[in-house]
Amino acid sequence: MQKKSSSKSHRATRGPSQRQLRAGELIRRALSDVVTRGTIQDPDLIERSFSVTEVRVSPDLRHATCFVAPLGKGDAAALAAALTRVRGYLRGQLSKEVTFKYMPDLTFEPDTSFDKAEQIDRLLHSPKVSQDLSPQDDEE
């Protein structure tokens, strides 16, 4: 008879659960709604356009990491720092929008996925890689 692997080690190899994904999407949408209302009084966030691109929630739903990206050119790290300053206010507003047993503690991080995608795109279009991807005439 084989032993079952522990759920913790099995969970570590898999991605987030359906519950985590659903909670993250609810928080992302509600956070976007709160931000678009324009009720945040922080001087670094007034008249600033940005997007909440993703929210990752811990398995116990007590912590949420919100990834933010400025629209247009801007400093994503400064944006994340400004949102961190008003996270108490945002958490309170979120509690009015979504119902959880415990409202997750919010952490804001700059979203670097767009930068990584741009870097990969530049690499794929570089002359060295292009010559490897183009068909050779002598192979036909």
UniProtKB/Swiss-Prot annotation:
GO cellular component terms listed in the entry, alphabetical order: cytosol
Keyword presence, Cell division: no
Gene3D superfamilies: 3.30.300.20
Annotated segments matching region Disordered: 1-22
Keywords: Cytoplasm, Ribosome biogenesis
Domain of life: Bacteria
Skewed-composition ranges (Basic residues): 1-13
Xref: InterPro entries: KH_dom-like_a/b, RbfA, RbfA_dom_sf
Pfam families linked: RBFA
One biological process term in Gene Ontology: maturation of SSU-rRNA
UniProt GO MF annotations: ribosomal small subunit binding
Compartments, record wording: Cytoplasm
Subunit structure, interactors included: Monomer. Binds 30S ribosomal subunits, but not 50S ribosomal subunits or 70S ribosomes.
Family named by the database record: Belongs to the RbfA family.
Entry-linked PANTHER family: RIBOSOME-BINDING FACTOR A, CHLOROPLASTIC-RELATED
Task performed by this protein: One of several proteins that assist in the late maturation steps of the functional core of the 30S ribosomal subunit. Associates with free 30S ribosomal subunits (but not with 30S subunits that are part of 70S ribosomes or polysomes). Required for efficient processing of 16S rRNA. May interact with the 5'-terminal helix region of 16S rRNA.
Listed name of the protein: Ribosome-binding factor A
Origin organism lineage: Bacteria, Pseudomonadati, Pseudomonadota, Alphaproteobacteria, Hyphomicrobiales
